[in-house]
A protein has these predicted regions:
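Transmembrane helical cores of multi-pass secondary ion antiporters/exchangers
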Residues: 1-416
Length: 416
């Protein structure tokens, strides 16, 4: 299949699955599309079992494997999705919660990676470094999944800022940690030039701080240009160029593209909106990026649903995946509870913050993409299967119940 054919097929499936969800299931759009995609995949498997001569599963698996999921997400869609998400997080709100967000996106990721890594190594017998790679890719909360659920759940604004801000930044931090650990665990295929902790620390600083600096510089330059223009079509195009071009420039400069996209989006969404856009331009920019967000979300969740055909399903792998769900939840609880406990003597937190942020820390497509991007090894199929099980549980079960958890903890309306 050509790239255009794959894109057309994904858009058709996203529209069809979204329609089925809207008319019948009536679930939050992203979750509903994923559920329908999984159901369609199950129907294909059943049809293949009933009519094996048709070879339906093999045909579909071949088509799915042609989709470079990791490349499509990590080098294409992710920059746009993060930029769109960051546009709608106000700097003033984030400034009030910056220390919580910073600790959860750094200390929290480190704690979660260690807990999952040691636990997964103990459960499966996997070498510790390889298990830590799994810990790194499953620890970040996915901003795409989180933002999709936040649109449907009526949470306390301060709590929503914590969850959204953390998900935007820990994604970039988690990716850098994953990159470092892949270089240490798989040195032949890794991207680090050396296997020392010094090299790892240098890479982390280069990727994280370099990405933030690039995002702020590009965002500021774009802001200055937009101040001189009053043409909504051109200004929408400029923001698109910033998100797409800036991400690719970050890749070329070997700095973090995700962190670049978040920093640029935050600056344009706050300072740019206030001082460089007319009311008409604000309306069009906001509407354009909301549509980009919705469309790419729909396509991404279709891709997650059909990636089941790329997963090796055995009883041992499924058991490891189910145990990984509990492991990921324990790690997430620790990643939330420790920073909040450290900050409690200095500031207050609303009731149920730890519970809601633990259950609302959804995993998503980024974890699957990182698992698929691992170099081939004897442990990759197990890591991919465990990742897929955790992600599906997180999006479907946690995503559908986080509203009820929030209601019991803080009196907000239910999600559905």
């Amino acid at each position: 299949m050509t790239l255009l054919q794959i894109a057309a097929a994904l858009l058709v499936l996203a529209a069809a699955f979204g329609t089925v969800n809207y008319l019948f299931l009536k679930l939050p759009s992203t979750i509903g599309i994923l559920v329908v995609a999984l159901a369609a995949s199950l129907v294909i498997v059943i049809a293949d079992a009933v009519f094996p001569a048709l070879g339906i599963t093999d045909t579909v698996r071949g088509a799915v494997l042609e989709i470079e999921f990791s490349e499509a997400l990590l080098e294409g869609m992710l920059g746009l999705l993060l930029f769109a998400g960051a546009l709608h997080v106000k700097l003033g709100d984030l400034r009030r919660e910056w220390l919580v967000v910073l600790l959860m996106a750094t200390l929290g990721i480190g704690l979660s990676t260690a807990i999952v890594g040691f636990g997964f190594s103990w459960i499966t017998g996997m070498p510790l470094m390889a298990a830590l790679v799994f810990g790194a890719l499953i620890s970040p909360t996915d901003p795409v999944a989180v933002m999709g659920v936040l649109r449907s759940a009526d949470l306390d604004p301060a709590l929503e800022t914590k969850i959204a801000g953390e998900s935007l930044f820990n994604d970039g931090v988690g990716y850098v940690v994953w990159l470092i650990l892949v270089g240490l665990a798989f040195p032949v295929a890794g991207e680090t030039e050396g296997g020392t902790l010094g090299d790892a620390a240098t890479l982390f600083v280069q990727e994280a701080l370099g990405g933030a600096a690039l995002g702020l510089v590009l965002g500021f330059v774009t802001f200055r240009v937009m101040r001189r223009i009053d043409d909504y079509a051109l200004e929408v195009l400029i923001t698109l160029a910033l998100a797409f071009g800036g991400y690719e420039l970050a890749v070329l400069l070997h700095v973090s593209g995700p962190i670049m996209a978040v920093c640029a989006g935050l600056l344009i969404g706050d300072v740019g909106t206030k001082h460089a856009m007319s009311a008409e331009t604000q309306t069009y920019v906001d509407g354009f990026w909301r549509m980009i967000d919705e469309i790419l979300n729909a396509v991404l969740f279709v891709m997650i649903g059909v990636e089941v055909f790329a997963v090796t399903i055995t009883s041992d792998y499924l058991i490891a995946g189910v145990l990984s769900i509990a492991l990921a939840l324990v790690a997430r609880f620790t990643a939330v509870a420790v920073p909040i406990t450290l900050l409690k003597p200095f500031r207050g937190f609303s009731a149920g913050t730890i519970r809601i942020m633990t259950w609302g820390g959804l995993k998503g497509g980024i974890s699957v993409a990182l698992a698929l991007a691992l170099p081939d090894s004897e442990w990759k199929p197990l890591i991919l299967t465990a990742t897929y099980v955790v992600v599906i549980f997180s999006i479907v079960v946690q995503g559908l119940t986080v509203g009820r958890v929030a209601e019991r903890a803080g009196g907000t309306p239910p999600l559905i």
